Curated annotation (Swiss-Prot):
Family: Belongs to the POU transcription factor family. Class-4 subfamily.
Residues in the DNA-binding region annotation: 274-333
Record-linked PANTHER family: POU DOMAIN, POU DOMAIN, CLASS 4, TRANSCRIPTION FACTOR 3
Protein name: POU domain, class 4, transcription factor 3
UniProt disease link: Deafness, autosomal dominant, 15: A form of non-syndromic hearing loss with variable phenotype in terms of age at onset, levels of progression, and shape of audiograms.
Gene Ontology molecular function: DNA-binding transcription activator activity, RNA polymerase II-specific; DNA-binding transcription factor activity; DNA-binding transcription factor activity, RNA polymerase II-specific; RNA polymerase II cis-regulatory region sequence-specific DNA binding; sequence-specific double-stranded DNA binding
Keyword flag DNA-binding: yes
Primary localization: nucleus
Function: Acts as a transcriptional activator. Acts by binding to sequences related to the consensus octamer motif 5'-ATGCAAAT-3' in the regulatory regions of its target genes. Involved in the auditory system development, required for terminal differentiation of hair cells in the inner ear.
Result, substituting residue 289 to F: In DFNA15; decreases subcellular localization in the nucleus; decreases DNA-binding activity; decreases transcriptional activity
Summary of the tissues where the protein is detected: Brain. Seems to be specific to the retina.
UniProt KW Nucleus keyword: yes
Keywords: Activator, Cytoplasm, Deafness, Differentiation, Disease variant, DNA-binding, Homeobox, Non-syndromic deafness, Nucleus, Transcription, Transcription regulation
Length: 338
């Protein structure tokens, strides 16, 4: 009974001996005292309540120090190193400033936001650690959020003013892409026009493909007849059609110019044998060929070469003569039967 009635002094934390709103302590010291776990004494039954009041008062004092720190010089490096050692987990969102243009454009806003961002980052966890209720914890981010939005607006404005050239390439890209890509309808019209002009000039698709090498265009050689055919029938890929169009257009312009000027340029047509005259075989050579045909109507390639060399004729001429002679014999037999 005596023990219960006796007045025992409550165990007080050493922090209570110091004035609550002392202006002698810096913000970093206040944060250290709030974040460091204080030993819970068994004799103090109101310990947690006192600590929450103390933490709330010290947090308000720290915010007050920040507001007063705007008017007098402040060393951010000392606060940064001291606060980095505080074992508090940051749950608040900060806006990192990593662009040098923003710092040079608005130095006052950048330094002010950096200092307050550092302090508020460590203040908000202390409010949750010290045991404040949900309404107080949700009020602080609501008060801080407009400041961050304003700082972000200044940051984006500074970045836009410092780097106006970064917007220009993006606006110019669609124009470049439109120049590179060609309209499919234009390709179709050119393919049809090319086909009609080629036929009017009397040039085959194979002649066009072979004559492209004579244009002396860098990186362009002769093409096959199937490639020209696929271009005219629009069965090539879109990229190949775009790449082949200027080459065929250059050939067509030169071919039409040569045709108008009546200038003989066989390399454009690749037609040295395209317009050769009808071959006429003299009577002595013709009698010799008829004699060979009577012996062997289907001579081998080696035999045709030997006959051509002996009669001083081209091998192709001898081969075609034997082929025509066989067709003539078939017609004669067919007419005799019927």
């Amino acid at each position: 009974m005596m023990a219960m009635n006796s007045k025992q002094p409550f165990g007080m934390h050493p922090v209570l001996q110091e004035p609550k709103f002392s202006s002698l302590h810096s913000g970093s010291e206040a944060m250290r005292r709030v974040c460091l776990p204080a030993p819970q004494l068994q004799g103090n039954i109101f310990g947690s309540f006192d600590e929450s009041l103390l933490a709330r008062a010290e947090a308000l004092a720290a915010v007050d120090i920040v507001s007063h720190g705007k008017n007098h010089p402040f060393k951010p490096d000392a606060t940064y190193h001291t606060m980095s050692s505080v074992p508090c987990t940051s749950t608040s969102s900060t806006v990192p400033i990593s662009h040098p243009a923003a710092l040079t454009s608005h130095p006052h806003h950048a330094v002010h936001q950096g200092l307050e961002g550092d302090l508020l980052e460590h203040i908000s966890p202390t409010l949750s650690v010290s045991g404040l209720g949900a309404p107080e914890h949700s009020v602080m981010p609501a008060q801080i959020h407009p400041h961050h939005l304003g700082a972000m607006g200044h940051l984006h404005q500074a970045m836009g003013m410092s780097h106006p050239h970064t917007v220009a390439p993006h606006s110019a890209m669609p124009a470049c892409l439109s120049d590179v890509e060609s309209d499919p309808r234009e390709l179709e019209a050119f393919a049809e026009r090319f086909k009609q002009r080629r036929i009017k000039l009397g040039v085959t698709q194979a002649d066009v493909g072979a004559a492209l090498a004579n244009l002396k265009i860098p990186g362009v050689g002769s093409l096959s007849q199937s490639t020209i055919c696929r271009f005219e029938s629009l069965t090539l890929s879109h990229n190949n059609m775009i790449a082949l169009k200027p080459v065929l257009q250059a050939w067509l312009e030169e071919a039409e110019a040569a045709y108008r000027e009546k200038n003989s340029k066989p390399e454009l047509f690749n037609g040295s044998e395209r317009k050769r005259k009808r071959t006429s075989i003299a009577a002595p050579e013709k009698r010799s060929l008829e004699a060979y045909f009577a012996i062997q109507p289907r001579p081998s390639s080696e035999k045709i070469a030997a006959i051509a060399e002996k009669l001083d004729l081209k091998k192709n001429v001898v081969r075609v003569w034997f082929c025509n002679q066989r067709q003539k014999q078939k017609r004669m037999k067919y007419s005799a039967v019927h």
